[in-house]
Amino acid sequence: QEMMLYKLIPPSVVTATIQLPTSKSISNRALIINALGKGIYPPENLSDCDDTQVMIKALTEGKETIDIMAAGTAMRFLTAYLSVTPGERTITGTARMQQRPIQILVNALRELGAEIEYVHNEGYPPLCIKGAELKGNEITLKGNVSSQYISALLMIGPALKDGLTLHLSGRDYFPSLYQPYIATDAGLWSQSRMDFSQ
């Protein structure tokens, strides 16, 4: 029986364009920064994940009650965003989301002057938020808080009259844990012509 032989010769040069999926974390940060900038820095190539779609709807539909479902990033970022934008809104989510604590972020925003009330249980969503210009410009947090709390606060810094200085302190503070997220925030701010120093 005759055997067929095939010889495959690779090309000397391979040229291709690859579209990588965008991080939902970066997409959600970019959406908040764009919203604070009144749409002058529109993000491109956004993630198509559920969290990002929830964020887009929340920022564009203008509803008084915002349901972020199970999107934890959206809950934290929007809580800070709604605190500095005019209007009274309620932000809620799934039953599981309403069991996830958010008191550290709410306390920090209140310290800056935000008007936030718990709808049902102290320390947990849903939240009723009256957005306004915040007068505070400096805050200290323990070093073991969620990096998303840090990002949520830093992202609204440019919306504060005198900017924001955020101190992270305590024996539980490990800069290496937060540096990648802060670097991501700083990169997005730089693209949006916002000043950041560390």
Where are these regions (language model features)?
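Structural preference for solvent-exposed beta-strand-turn elements
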Residues: E2-Q198
